[in-house]
UniProtKB/Swiss-Prot annotation:
Induction summary: Down-regulated by caloric restriction. Up-regulated by insulin and IGF1.
Location of the protein in the cell: Cytoplasm
Gene: Wdr6
PROSITE patterns: WD_REPEATS_1 (PS00678), WD_REPEATS_2 (PS50082), WD_REPEATS_REGION (PS50294)
Entry keyword Repeat: yes
Source organism of the structure: Rattus norvegicus (Rat)
Protein name as it appears in the record: tRNA (34-2'-O)-methyltransferase regulator WDR6
Length: 1125
């Protein structure tokens, strides 16, 4: 200690873990969940709030929790306290817990018992615990004195893949073992002789053609269920297994999963199974699928539990999410699909179109011009009118609103539009709008104040009709307000429309895929030079004219703003205005969030629906503020929730190339469509939303490849962040609101997630996810961190620009704004705006002489990013930083960000390394009376680190950047200033830190587990030479150089120099290690074992002097550590 003086060694403690949920168990109205070695306790009291009561950290040491077994109470009362055996991997610990309504207290804890074999199952036997071990043996353990009482092996010492213990005493204990030979072995440990000789199996049961992963026994009915690698679930009639020699009969072979089945559980009336396909299926005991729960992401559902009294199923997934689902009986009241039996001799003609007026009235029109109404309360068809002018071609649309405002509109091929009051069809009003075919109809509603009907005619002319009702309510008035003109295209008609609040603009989508903004009232744009251009019939000869009009009247107003072909050539399917944003959907499988600023449409974010849903038909906003997506997945109509990643409703309708309609209210939702010449109706009570509860949001479905801290948000006392634990159990000084760190993560699942990590609650809140990438996200970079309103008018919150990059040589730039919002669980609202994107193959496709160039490898991956902040007065480049990218094709590429990230341009590249570049990092060198130098370092798979002077390269007229061989190609960066051979193999981590002496510490970690630390000196001439002289290139040299060959046992994937005397490193060996610097070779200080496997990235940052540092480790999960300096 004397050698270290008064320096205090940092001790890292785990603050937060987000890992796959591997164990679940219901105890009364509480849920026990195992996440890594931690125990999570949730309160499932449905009369109050569903919330976490307690997190017991590090209960199983370095083992993962796989199961819980609660000791039965003679009185059956587990509401006050319980004795729980927690097991997983090779560890067992017994803990006694006292719990109340909103608190939990640990009364007693046994020592951690380390077994020599894997524990597959545990069972309480009269105060002792029996364990089924991995090589077909059973041990009896006394948890109080901590000793083994019995150890009985089976004669067949095969490796097990699962086991189930049955019985309440040692004498009747039965083990059903799932062997790797795909057999079930039933044997009885108590039949062993006094010398504990191996016991022979009583029965061998075969049937599965794959390894058996899970089994469940229902004693009351004598049933055994097994889940297997062969993607099936089998139900066996076994009777009382505690009696030897019984007969085993296979009574059910259930196929419903598309991948391996991990878990199975038998209930009194149901069978629950969950697997690698992220689906939880509810079966009857006869093998019929009753329900299917989909919502988890990633590689499967790892744990299931059931609360039979409340009829809930609880699932824990690989995405670290926990969800509750209603079982049938308390479940989702779907009424299914029914035929409305339209075909009748009294109703001639064939059906042409169908629509819904609210959720309980169906409208249909036939090819003889008959309009019919079906009332779901009366349950019969009624003819409203018949008009032979609509017999060959007819469009039908009902007005929006809860019950359609009692209006519908018909249009034919001769320019005629008929507006029909449903309750008084004799009061219908005809409008002859065009001298040709009406291509489309749509309604636009502004509250209960304004109702418009838009009709598209020949030549791209859209007639806007204003609909109003007479004071008596028995008549309607139809008045043409104005006409719009769509941009030229082959299929020139609009497809949808909506009012933009407060009602000055109309947003329309057209068949070409464009989103257009029109004035709702032309009188608003009467000032010269303002608004849309008025186009006359002479300027648009194909537009046609209104009946009784002349050729000199205004035919159409052009859009004030447009986003051309936003959704591709398949067209826009819907536009919706909500919360100050415009949402558009299309048949390109995406939906856009748009913003109108200064009368201009601006794209904010592009999102994708679930995989395979290429036809998105619309969006609906739920009462709880969430959004659901309507669309077609092959021949199915699907209602999908982006929040829960769940298909809420699935209707096998045959696809979207037919007449269909959807209506949604809080009371019910309805979907009507034509099939086999009849009207089919799917109806479900309760609206779109399915009654499930997300106890904890999932993070990523695949491995997390990168993590980056953005900044910190400070909330005032009015934004109280909810604590996970009861206030009595919190440490002093941790009450109330505090600092919230904003962290972004990228994953193999192609998403970028924004997380809020409060410093006082030990929680993680997923704010939003960005799904723009088409392949995995490998690297993240942050720049321009500030506050909303800027430095002049600062507001609480955080703003930043983020660059993400990964597979398929794809890069995206988006802006991030975090603001306080008391209505959300995290007390924060996150706003994302997509700014720009870049792909190397698209860049190649845009080149005119691309036939002379070699096309970039489409499998190129961006491995790492670094922001290079140039001086703001750089001539010729304009404002904006450079982004350096390490590429798998051996290149280091420089991209220029301009216009606050809205322009992303490839500027220069170099293939100096000639092999995969793994890391890039940038730093600045500042010295008195000298220019600020920007230096980039890059590291490759050969262990070399190259240093580049970007300041000289970016100077106007500099010859450091060599001109390209062909116009349009990027510049070449030339040769580096210095190359250091730091390692013998790939460099996976790299960091630098300036020293007080004016030098730079450079640290790197390699694939061979070694560390390399050296001091880099940057030497420059004392005086800058004038323009026109020879360029000044800095001289870089290494002063001190040290290596630690065996610092870690595996790849070093994260390294950070915290100070000139302290460094921290992380590795795949799951060690977070601190090193002392400054006295020669780095000296080991201490190491902490973390629980995230395959760590791919690490980021560390100081919080404040009172809280110290925080460190985020990302891999197959996320773990946050903190330590005090």
């Amino acid at each position: 200690m004397d050698a270290f003086g008064d320096y205090v060694w940092p001790r890292a403690t785990s603050e937060l873990i987000l890992l796959p949920v591997t164990g679940l168990e219901c105890v009364g109205d509480r849920l026990l969940a195992g996440e890594g070695p931690d125990l999570l306790v949730y309160n499932l009291d449905f009369g109050g709030h569903l919330r976490m009561v307690k997190r017991v950290q590090n209960l199983l040491g370095h083992y993962l929790i796989h199961g819980f077994r609660v000791q039965p109470e003679p009185k059956g009362d587990l509401d006050s306290e319980a004795m729980i055996a927690v097991f997983g991997s090779k560890g067992l610990r017994v803990v006694k817990i006292s719990w109340g309504q909103s608190h939990l207290r640990e009364l007693w804890r046994s020592g951690l018992w380390n077994m020599s074999d894997w524990i597959w199952d545990a069972r309480w036997l009269e105060g002792n615990v029996a364990l089924a071990l991995g090589h077909n043996s059973v041990v009896l353990y006394d948890p109080v004195i901590g000793c083994m009482l019995q150890d009985v092996p089976c004669t067949d010492r095969c490796t097990l893949s699962s086991a189930c213990l049955i019985g309440d005493t040692w004498k009747e204990l039965t083990i059903v073992a799932g062997a790797v030979s795909n057999e079930l072995l039933v044997w009885y440990p108590a039949t062993a002789l006094p010398d504990n000789k191996p016991v022979a199996p009583d029965r061998r049961v075969s049937g599965h053609v794959g390894v058996i992963f899970s089994m469940s026994y229902l004693e009351s009915k004598g049933l055994l269920a097994t889940a297997s690698e062969d993607r099936s679930v089998r139900i066996w009639k076994v009777g009382d297994l505690r009696v030897p020699g019984g007969r085993v009969q296979n009574i059910g072979h259930c196929f419903g999963h598309s991948a391996r089945v991990w878990q199975v559980k038998l209930l009194e009336n149901y069978l629950i199974s969950a697997g690698e396909d992220c689906v939880c299926l509810v079966w009857s005991h006869e093998g019929e699928i009753l329900q299917a729960f989909r919502g988890h992401q990633g590689r499967g559902i790892r744990a299931i539990a059931a609360h039979e009294r409340q009829t809930w199923v609880i699932t824990g997934g690989d995405d670290s999410g926990i969800r509750l689902w209603h079982l049938v009986g308390r479940g989702y009241p779907g009424l299914g699909v029914s035929s409305l039996s339209f075909k009748s001799p009294s109703r001639p003609g064939a059906l042409k179109a169908v629509t819904l007026a609210g959720s309980w009235r169906v409208l249909a029109v036939t090819d003889v011009g008959g309009l019919y109404l079906y009332d779901l309360e009366v349950k019969c068809w009624e003819q409203l009118l018949e008009d032979n002018r609509f017999q060959s071609y007819c469009l039908l649309e009902a007005a929006p609103g809860p019950e359609g405002f009692g209006l519908c509109a018909l249009a034919n091929g001769e320019g005629l539009v008929k507006v029909v009051p449903i309750n008084t069809p004799t009061a219908a009003v005809d409008q002859n709008l065009f001298q040709g075919k009406v291509h489309s109809l749509s309604w636009a509603l502004r509250g209960y104040e304004e109702l418009l009907l838009l009709a598209s005619g020949p030549g791209g002319v859209v007639a806007c009709l204003e609909i109003s009702a007479a004071p008596t309510g028995k008549a309607i008035f139809v008045k043409e307000r104005c006409r719009y003109l769509l941009p030229p295209s082959k299929q020139r008609w609009h497809t949808c429309s909506a009012f933009l609040p407060p009602g000055d603009f109309l947003v329309c989508g057209d068949r070409r895929g464009s989103v257009l903004l029109f004035p709702a009232r032309p009188c608003l744009f009467k000032k010269p030079g303002v608004g849309p251009k008025a186009i006359t019939a002479a300027e648009a000869p194909q537009a046609g004219s209104s009946s009784g009009g002349s050729e000199s009247v205004v035919t159409g107003l052009g859009p004030v703003s447009s986003l051309h072909s936003l959704h591709g050539k398949q067209g826009v399917t819907s536009v919706t205005c909500h919360g100050g944003y415009v949402y558009s959907t299309g048949r390109d499988g995406s939906y856009y969030q748009l913003f109108v600023h200064g009368g201009r449409l601006q794209p904010v974010l592009r999102q994708k629906a679930c995989r395979g849903m290429n036809w998105i038909a619309g969006l609906r906003m739920a009462p709880d503020g969430s959004m659901v997506v309507l669309g077609f997945h092959a021949n199915e109509f699907v209602v999908w929730s982006p929040r829960s990643h769940e298909k809420l409703h699935i209707v096998n309708c045959g696809g979207g190339h037919r007449s269909w309609a959807f209506s949604d209210t809080e009371a019910a939702m309805a979907f009507a469509y034509l099939k086999d010449g009849d009207v089919m109706l799917y109806r479900a009570l309760g609206g779109c939303i399915r009654p499930n509860v997300i106890l904890r949001e999932g993070l990523h479905g695949r491995e997390i490849t990168c993590v980056k801290r953005v900044g910190t948000v400070t909330l005032g006392p009015e934004f109280e962040v909810p604590n996970l634990e009861h206030p009595d159990s919190l440490e002093p000084g941790s009450e109330g609101p505090g600092l919230i760190d904003i962290v972004i993560t990228g994953s193999e699942d192609t998403t970028v997630c924004v997380l809020a990590l409060p410093t006082t609650t030990g929680a993680a809140h997923a704010l939003t996810a960005v799904c723009n990438h088409i392949s995995s996200v490998r690297a993240l970079a942050v720049w321009g961190v500030g506050t909303p309103g800027g430095p002049q008018d600062s507001h609480p919150g955080l703003t930043a620009q983020v660059v993400s990059a990964g597979g398929r040589a794809e890069m995206h730039c988006f802006s991030l704004m975090i603001t306080p919002d008391a209505s959300t669980p995290s007390r924060l609202a996150c706003h994302i705006m997509h700014l720009s994107s870049h792909r190397l193959d698209e860049y190649w496709d845009r080149q005119r002489n691309r036939h002379r160039m070699i096309k970039v490898d489409p499998e190129t991956r961006y491995m790492s990013l670094a922001i290079c902040e140039l001086d703001s007065d750089r001539p010729g480049l304009g404002p904006g930083p450079l982004v350096a990218a390490a590429c798998s094709d051996g290149a280091v590429r420089l991209f220029l960000l301009q216009d606050s990230g809205r322009i992303l341009h490839l500027l220069a590249e170099t293939f100096h390394h000639k092999r995969c570049v793994l890391k890039v990092h940038s730093f600045t060198h500042e010295a008195p009376n000298q220019r600020r130098r920007l230096i980039l370092c890059s590291a490759a798979t050969d262990g070399s680190i190259a240093f580049w002077d970007l300041t000289t390269a970016m100077d106007r007229g500099s010859t450091t950047l060599e001109p390209p061989a062909h116009p349009g190609l990027p510049y070449q960066m030339g040769t580096p200033c210095l190359t250091v051979q730091a390692h013998s193999c790939g460099v996976n981590s790299l960091h630098t830190l300036p020293t007080p002496e004016g030098h730079h510490l450079v640290a790197s970690g390699s694939e061979d587990g070694s560390l390399h630390v050296f001091t880099l000196a940057v030497k420059m001439p004392e005086l800058e030479e004038a323009d026109g002289e020879a360029e000044l290139v800095p001289q870089l040299c290494v002063l001190d150089e040290y290596s630690v060959p065996c610092a870690h046992a595996a790849h070093v994937t994260g390294i950070k120099i915290l100070s000139p005397k302290l460094m921290v490193s992380a590795s795949i060996d799951q060690r977070l290690t601190f090193w002392r610097l400054g006295n020669g070779e780095p000296t080991f200080m201490n190491s902490t074992v973390y629980h995230v496997p395959d760590v791919a990235d690490m980021d560390c940052w100081p919080v404040n002097p009172e809280f110290g540092h925080r460190c985020a480790l990302a891999g197959q999960g996320l773990e946050v550590y903190n330590w005090y300096d």
